[in-house]
Amino acid sequence: AIMAGLVGSEMCIRDRLFSPSKVVATAKHFIGDGGTTDGIDQGNTEVSEQELRDIHGQGYMSAIESGVQTIMATFNSWNGSKVHGNNYLLNEVLKEQMGFEGFVIGDWTGHGQVNGCNDEQCAKAINAGVDMIMVPFAWKAFFENTVNQVENGEIAITRINDAVKRILRVKARSGIIGGDLPSERQYSNQTNFLGSETHRLVAREAVRKSLVLLKNKNSILPLKRNQRILVTGPAANSIGQQSGGWTITWQGTGNSNADFPNGTSVYDGISQVVSDGGGTIILSTDGTYSGSRPDAAIVVYGETPYAEGAGDLSSLEYQSGSKTDLNILKSLKDQGIPIISIFLSGRPLWVNAEINASDAFIAAWLPGSEGIGIADVIFTNNEETVNYDFSGKLSFSWPNTPT
């Protein structure tokens, strides 16, 4: 679906693949980066070819059928062989067997990890089928070395011609060749589309549909809007945390809510819904509150943002050291307050203790800028009937042990 949205449905028009409102999409990272041993970033995927195809390759088949024009090679290895230098996977499997006509792009200096290569030269990656090398720093040396490698026969000129043909084909299909200047294209400088209401409504819908209800003791959800609700937890009012890594910055850290104009935190969304329903909202990061006891506590917590190797784990246990979030849950539970856990994460984690301490537990993943999408589901409408029901399903198993 996302591929169709990016490239459109004009797949049969070979001389002009995309309409002016569409873009060239990239599928990545080919192949097996989600199956490395122990989940280590840029690690080694130790599986059979059948498992590699059946589990890690299916998404690429669908992407190719839907018109993806570029595919990025992965940093990881397959059974010890770096994919950037794997002729069988890139040339024979991807281009020949899977029929990929676009071009393969390397990842950030990924070629430098291939045996016998470095950041400044890698004939092996080019010969293996990488058509466009990503060289952020040593590009002048890489260019000169590649020319020399063609001249001395390390790289066949037919391989260069194939790479150039593939790149030009994508440019032609996207209308770049012979088309308008970038500054003259239909949507040039149309910044009003960024963060537009229409786009945000789609994002809000995506949040609603991706929520997975893992526990709902005594059918506590959905909550009525006219209650006294405590919203607490370290992520309750943090759009940055609910957006994760690769958000504004590489690691997604150091962001404040002010960096997300018009975005809504989980608290913002709940506050809007509860206030509209005649209820009372209390915000607290540590579970404390003043006044009468809340009718329910919504505790928002989870992973802090990370990207790439910074997210590597030695255990799947959430907060394997200090259980600060679990302590909040236990404190509220001891007071007899019903607890709804909103768990933010980019992956399944072992949270048995947190689930057991909660009356309801929701895997909310990373809802991004539209925290209000969570409130749409966990509260009734003004008629006190279901507003939006939970529809999200786990597409993979949830860990039963921390190892």
Language model features with spans:
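Positively charged, low-complexity/disordered segments
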Residues: A1-E10
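Glycoside hydrolase catalytic-domain context in secreted enzymes
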Residues: S9-T403
